[in-house]
């Protein structure tokens, strides 16, 4: 019985890791595709993970900003934190930053695209991109 429980736990753990790796591959592919298709302006950083336009493109492909409701954007942003960051402390920091940025940047009369760009810029200024798995595997 103990062996069965252990095998079941290991199988569940392997499925979680596989799903996370699959999601990361998709996000990496989205970032690479966005980097290829978006023009780089002269004043933009060389690091693609420091570019707001690349993150906006990749997150838009994942549907993070499809719904203009701030609560939905916050929920989807927090889910994205768990997909692109593995360290639990950094995940919690990412969630706090995402919540703060969504709350701040969704105030006032701006287009949904501008709100999304502002949210990403806020998160990048807070250093979230440096804690992602993507930053470690450039």
Swiss-Prot record:
Domain of life assignment: Eukaryota
UniProt-annotated location(s): Secreted
Major place of residence: secreted
Disulfide bond sites: 34-57, 81-94, 101-122
UniProt note on tissues of expression: Expressed by the venom gland.
Signal peptide: 1-19
InterPro entries linked to this entry: Ant_venom_allergen_Sol_i_2, Ant_venon_allerg_soli_2/4_sf, Sol_i_2/4
Gene3D superfamilies: 1.10.238.190
Cell inner membrane keyword on record: no
Keywords: Allergen, Disulfide bond, Secreted, Signal
Gene Ontology cellular component annotations, sorted alphabetically: extracellular region
Family: Belongs to the ant venom allergen 2/4 family.
Record's subunit section: Homodimer; disulfide-linked.
Protein name stated in the entry: Venom allergen 2
